[in-house]
Amino acid sequence: MSNKIIVALDYETEKEALQLVDQIDPSLCRLKVGKEMFTTLGTNFVKLLQDRDFDVFLDLKFHDIPNTVARAVRSAADLGVWMVDLHASGGLRMMEEAKKILEPYGKDAPILISVTVLTSMEDLDLLQIGINASPMEQVIRLAHLSQRAGLDGVVCSPQEVEILRQHLGKEFKLITPGIRPVGSEFGDQRRVMTPPAAIEAGSDYLVIGRPITQAANPAEVLRSINASIANLIA
């Protein structure tokens, strides 16, 4: 069983999402629910996915005052999600409080990760918001801060994986969007890589959306991706 693939559900309706979900095997992937779907469909949709035996990554990228983020993370834990994220740019105290509030959940706590630099952002984008650093420099800075706060990992582009492993060690989880099988379009992700290359670079989990969700045969594409990385994770 492969647990490396996280399928990003980016649909406008529950019906469309479930049509995809009911075609794929929960033993071959996990599912990511982002802002659009969660805002539209709420916790009931997450429960529908869990009822189908899928682990859910609740990708809401919390970013607010520490108390508010901590309470939101606790709500995610109560929902039983597998993974939840927040913005590292919210600061050390925000991340520490979010991690602390999960202590009573023990082994049932969700994996808590941070978003460092969005994969759509380049040097100019950072400069325009007052950050005079390259995406790589900012990723490293915020990843170190996340580890210091006790978080379990970070979201990062595949090209950043190798250097983050050097800085943060083998146990810190690296979750990588910007994954495109050979032949796929890049879309709005600027820093991309194929699944085998990402695994070889050291990624723990690969977030893949449209190459699977917009495929004529999503189940076959998912099986093909898993087959392409099977010998790398055995």
UniProtKB/Swiss-Prot annotation:
Instruction: Report the EC number(s), separated by commas if there are several.
Output: 4.1.1.23
Which of the seven top EC classes does this enzyme belong to? lyase
Q: Which reaction does it catalyse?
A: orotidine 5'-phosphate + H(+) = UMP + CO2
InterPro entries attached to this UniProt entry:
Aldolase_TIM, OMPdecase, OMPdecase_AS, OMPdecase_bac, OMPdeCOase_dom, RibuloseP-bd_barrel
- UniProt KW Lyase keyword: yes
Its pathway is: Pyrimidine metabolism; UMP biosynthesis via de novo pathway; UMP from orotate: step 2/2
The organism's superkingdom is given as Bacteria
Keywords, comma-separated and alphabetical: Decarboxylase, Lyase, Pyrimidine biosynthesis
UniProt xrefs under Gene3D superfamilies: Aldolase class I (3.20.20.70)
Stated name of the protein: Orotidine 5'-phosphate decarboxylase
Origin organism is: Mannheimia succiniciproducens (strain KCTC 0769BP / MBEL55E)
